[in-house]
């Protein structure tokens, strides 16, 4: 029994010990390499080869998708080169109705989406007005 415990203790020491016999027992620290930093470095090298220059003071950028949603960037990092724009930062995919100030940015090609939004707003307004009862004063009912 004691021999078994001694053998197990010796095995445990071998796994924990990182040096020789007289070294302190400690666990090896595992460092995880993040692949995103490598990808970012490669991207920055390619952008530097293109010769992009940063554009400051851009508050927002919107990409209009064919399905009616918008990819919205708030305070993006914008860089430009010849016929090339790079927009990076945190983005959100939102429906067009959730960002009403972008309607002014839409062109003639998005006229169908504007009509759909107007119909949806008017239908919602009509649905809400039916539920509100008419207020009647007690004096006029005599």
UniProtKB/Swiss-Prot annotation:
InterPro entries: BTF3 (IPR039370), NAC_A/B_dom_sf (IPR038187), Nas_poly-pep-assoc_cplx_dom (IPR002715). The keyword Zinc-finger does not apply. It is found in: Cytoplasm; Nucleus. Residues 17-38 are annotated as: Disordered. It comes from the Eukaryota. Its main location: cytoplasm. Belongs to the NAC-beta family. This is Nascent polypeptide-associated complex subunit beta. It comes from Dictyostelium discoideum. The gene is nacB.
